[in-house]
Amino acid sequence: VKEEALTPALSRSRERGIRFAGYAAVFDRPDKGGDIVRKGAFARALERAGEVPLLWQHKAGAVIGRIEHLSEDERGLRVIAAVGDARASRLLVSGKVGGLSFGYRVREATAVGSQRELVELDLVEVSLVANPMQPRARVHAVEVAPS
C-alpha cells in the first residue's frame, strides 16, 4: 500500500482522517470461488445507486466510513473512500489490511464450466477486508489528512 495523494481535486476534500483508493472488483479475472466479473457488470447499478455503504469485513452493522467515488474503468470497480473508524484506519495505514470486496445480488450471470461470468450485478456494499475473494482487489493508495 502506497501513501500518496489520490488526486489534487479529491485531496481538497473537507473529510479529515484516512482516505484510500483501490479496486473492489477486478474485471475478467476469476476469484477464489470461480466467479468472473465482466466489464459493465456494475454500469446499471452505478446509474441507480444511492449511497453505497463502506463496511468492515462485510458486517452489516460495521460501517467504517463513506464512499466518495465509485466508477468502472478498464481495470474494474474503482473506489475512493474516507475511513472514519479508528481501528480500520490504523490497520489500513499500517498495511495490515488492504483487501477490498463487495456485496452484490446477481441480475445476470452465465455458467461457463465450473465458473460463473457475472454480467450484471446490483451493488449492495463495499468492504475493507483482510482476505479478499479476488486477490487483485486491493487498496493501492492511502492518504493521511493533516490534523
What kind of feature is each model-predicted range?
Residues V1-L10, A49-G50, Q57-S71, D85:
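Short small/polar-residue motifs
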Residues V1-S13, G17-R48, V142-P146:
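Polar/acidic, low-complexity leader/linker segments enriched in S/T/G and N/D
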Residues S11, G33, W56, P135-R138:
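A generic alpha-helix propensity feature with a strong bias for hydrophobic helices
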Residues G17-A21, R29, P53, R66-S147:
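Residue microenvironments linked to proteolytic maturation
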Residues P30-K39, L54-G61, G84:
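Short low-complexity stretches enriched in small and charged residues
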Residues R44, G50-K59, L100-S101:
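Short conserved beta-strand and strand-loop elements enriched in small hydrophobics
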